[in-house]
């Protein structure tokens, strides 16, 4: 089955929206754990790092969704070329093609 560009974009949008929800849920859970006496079984430094990862995931996903609405999603911010679909499927929030990512 072949997908049109619009179909693939819609699938990637759905994936990004799911990831946004997952990151938000994770951040909520980690925030609740941080308020517990035992920090949900995590030491405070690990919990802080997990919160930072969840926050970064929310920000990256939100930026990708913003780029979709602006029509710039899938365009490398380094070279201006299209980011290959396989890369976007593997990392939907990608801002760079692989060569530009490796240079940064």
Language model features with spans:
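Short functional micro-motifs and their immediate structural scaffolds
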Residues: 73, 84-85, 102
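Short, cysteine/histidine-rich loop/knuckle motifs that typically chelate Zn2+
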Residues: 78-79, 99
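Short Cys/His-rich "knuckle" micro-motifs
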Residues: 86-90
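Acidic interhelical loop/turn segments
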Residues: 36-40, 78, 84
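Short metal-coordination and nucleic-acid-contact micro-motifs, chiefly zinc-binding Cys/His arrays
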Residues: 69-72, 93
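Cysteine-rich micro-motifs
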Residues: 93-103
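Cys/His-enriched microdomains
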Residues: 56, 74-77, 95
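Interaction interfaces in information-processing and related assembly proteins
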Residues: 1-70
